[in-house]
Amino acid sequence: MNKTQALHQFWNSFEIDAYEENSVPDDAKLPYITYQNESDMLDVKCLLTANIWYKSTSWKKIIDKAEEISKKINLHGHYIKEFDNGFLYITSGEPFMQTMSDPADELVKRVLLNITIEYLCSY
């Protein structure tokens, strides 16, 4: 598994689809996660964002999903995923979570997550 696959696997471990932010299929249905991918760097911290998207009258499900992600990252103060020749190291950014509404559709809810990732080389 390479770095990109490790990050993709992390975001797809939350029981909803996840896509790199510029590759969401036209027929994708909410809820889903979009995320940035900076896989060119090694041994450098990168500040990235991910977005959780839901369509609902309530914020409960989307906030619950954000808290699930937070728990996975912060269980040990970080999350580590092994990939070929290294490790993906994820920590929470600050602020970790921001809620946003969509002015075009009041049912669309968005939570922006700030994270820090670092690809640590093992050779």
Report each predicted region and the residues it spans.
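Charged, amphipathic alpha-helical segments and their flanking helix caps
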Residues: 1-22, 26-27, 34-123
